[in-house]
């Protein structure tokens, strides 16, 4: 008899909305404190400068409001946990859209406009609203979970590139960690390896003998930020192991062939 299909993780919609709003606010305040030299630095993401990365983060909120302004789609095609695998082909399109939407205005103005627009749009719609998106139609509730990934990942990018110290909202960090952990389990289903990302997530993955009790024979453990960097291609498996940011035990506890999940 095949194993029962795992029920998708549930997220508290009110907490996710609050986390997205709070993290965007953290970034807006942090960007406002960056000086010209910091804004001119390379972001580490292709040819983008830190200023262009900051503008892209403003576009994340701006595009959410724009999506909610369009007529709704009929039914969702994509869930939150499937979203990481649908993003790679759209990188160029998203970059171009961000440039067109945000060109010509100073960053403080971009953030004020985008934040206000996002707040109005979220107040007007419930989580059941289905957005018509390039990557596939999604409910607003699911799409907001993916916004925690975008915001947390790019906040970390900004901090590293600009030498900033923009805080990560705990609920946003938790949702980002959990979504990317669940995406790993979706990509490599099974129960032979236990991946622990305390204090937010534990998942089992990879086909093979299933662990049932006691200490699992194959364990991977790391912290949330290292996991997020691994899952999004900001660092690689070998480097994380060498720097002791990942602990892996057991002959199957090698995730290098599965990472990054998105880049």
Enumerate the predicted regions with their spans.
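C-terminal interaction segments
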Residues: 2-6, 70, 85, 89, ...
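A glycine-rich beta-turn/hairpin centered on an aromatic-Pro dipeptide
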Residues: 171-199
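Short, helix-capping/interhelical loops that line the mouth of catalytic, cofactor-
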Residues: 2-15, 63-116
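Amphipathic alpha-helix face/heptad-repeat signature
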Residues: 16-23, 107-114, 144-147, 173, ...
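An N-terminal domain-cap segment
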Residues: 2-51
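Internal, conserved structured core segments that host functional sites
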Residues: 94-147
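Glycine/small-residue-rich hydrophobic helix-like segments
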Residues: 189-226
